[in-house]
A protein has these predicted regions:
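Glycine-rich phosphate-binding loops of nucleotide-dependent enzymes
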Residues: 2-256
Length: 256
């Protein structure tokens, strides 16, 4: 039986002047999986995300989504196809309410301009769906509170809600638990697991506890190239991964 891949890259390369940031990466993301992209700082993880969403143009290689070549498509077209990215840096509007932020995302899905100036009555038609999305991430009780007043974990949940508003088939999560305390990490991890139902998630994540808890498949990058792949048990047992993260070869560690 053939494997159903929602996203594939073939010999993906990104070169800057005198530097190769992504080096012949062949990524295969299985439909319905939570797939983690990990590696030490500077490994090329975020650059891969930027290539997938056309924030950067590949030097060489091919990107396939549902078997269709999207390598030359623009960012907006890729998003309309169903590849939607939730950013590492907060992308919500801090001085709008939680509900208003989700309504803005829903307007994007409809292809409209952002009607900040229109009366609530005109935008009320979006409230039902917005509240459904807030309920899906546990924010329904905070719908009418100002976003800037929310703790970091709730802001992250709101970012996920606004991403869900665009109905992604493939959700790209860039460091979803970065900067969080333990309690928020657990809440957001549980939320990612919940929203992964009926969709595929590709995430960049440094927290290996989160990766071990969530990821069906892991790809480890080092210096822009794939070091190894597999489930958490396979990857964590690979001495090259320990060396990449700790800078110490496994045999050196044993004799230390």
């Amino acid at each position: 039986m053939s494997v159903d891949y929602v996203l594939q890259t073939s010999d993906l390369v990104k070169e800057f002047k005198g530097f190769t940031a992504v080096d012949n990466v062949n990524l295969n993301v299985k439909r319905g999986d939570i797939h983690a992209l990990i590696g030490p700082n500077g490994a090329g993880k975020t650059t891969v995300f930027n290539l997938l969403t056309k924030f950067l143009i590949p030097t060489r290689g091919q990107i396939l989504f549902n078997g269709e070549d999207i390598t030359q498509m623009r960012s907006a077209e890729i998003a309309r196809k169903g590849v939607v990215r939730s950013f590492q840096i907060s992308a919500v509007f801090p001085h709008l309410t939680v509900l208003e932020n989700v309504r803005i995302a829903l307007q994007r899905k409809e292809g409209n301009s952002f009607h900040f100036w229109k009366s609530d009555k005109i935008l009320d038609k979006l409230n039902g769906r917005a509240m459904e999305l807030l309920e899906s991430v546990g924010l329904q009780d905070y719908a009418h509170t100002v976003t800037v007043d929310q703790p970091y974990g709730r802001k992250r949940a709101l970012e996920i809600a606004t991403t869900l508003a665009l109905e992604p088939e493939l959700m790209l999560l860039d460091e979803p638990t970065q900067g969080m305390g333990h309690e928020d990490v657990e809440v957001v991890s549980d939320l990612i697991k919940k929203v992964s139902k009926d969709r595929t998630i590709l995430m960049v994540e440094h927290n290996l506890h989160v990766v071990s808890k969530l990821a069906d498949q892991i790809t480890v990058l080092q210096r822009g190239a794939i070091l190894t792949e597999g489930d958490y048990a396979t990857v964590s047992a690979d001495p090259r991964v320990k060396e990449a993260y700790l800078g110490v070869a496994a045999d050196e560690e044993e004799t230390a």
